[in-house]
Amino acid sequence: RALAPRPAVAVRCQEGQLAVTVRRDLFGTGRPVRAAELSLGTASCPPLSPNSAQAFVTFVAALHECGSTLQVTPDSLIYRTTLFYKPTPSGNPLIVRATPAEVLIECHYPRKSNVSSGAVHPTWAPFRSTVAAQERLRFSLRLMDDDWSRERLSNSFQLGDSLRFQADVTSEGHVPLRLFVDQCVATVSPDRSSSPRYAFIDLGGCLVDGRADDTGSAFVSPRPRPESLRFLVDAFKFAGDAGNLLYISCHLRVTPVAQAPNPWNKACSFSKASGLWAPLEGTAAICSCCDTGSCPSPG
């Protein structure tokens, strides 16, 4: 018989204290939160000596500690406190990749026995992403399922998810073509020049979002074919924006397959392992301008 997975937050109400166990993969996205981003109560009590290698973080506190409150009812004593998740700000102040969360915790102590609060499964509200591509020839830009086998049926995502984009061009009747993405911009309105705006691909093919410490955004290697290009972008939203809709517009271009990639036509991802920009095809030199920001404008 398969064991049920442990809940994201579990509470044990003991005789004079409570113990809270928090799964580091708090939201079930596969991206663990940092122990330092978690605290208990209004007094911001830290967890017990956290170990980054462990899958769980534990808090232990006396019932009256960490700013807890007590309610006395005819049948019970009810101690209340709150688990806070306050994500570390992104390196880019324009965007956020995680939103704060609060989990209310209660311990009920009846006259003859005690009970623990039920398991809590916090979630983020999803936001929707609407994709539009500038069309030249017959271009398309699609959100794909996790295995890239078909177009994703839903445009709803949660922070912590990865967005899988596939760009294509239909090249019948043309010389063999290679597709590139010059720029992709996210906005909160259909106007790609509106503000706020965030260019996560820029400089003629640099996936600049992958440069941030908290992302795994990158072009996918190898291509399925020269006229297709896949890339991953970690889900995000604009800081301070109460809406749940993003518009993504990308500028696509093609070159003949016979033409080698160059600083004008490139697909460059930042490698966290090497600390360097790496091209999907071509020599490393074509990506050097991604660091300097002096890439030549595509023709």
Report the location of each language-model feature.
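Long, disordered, Ser/Thr/Pro-rich
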Residues: R1-G299
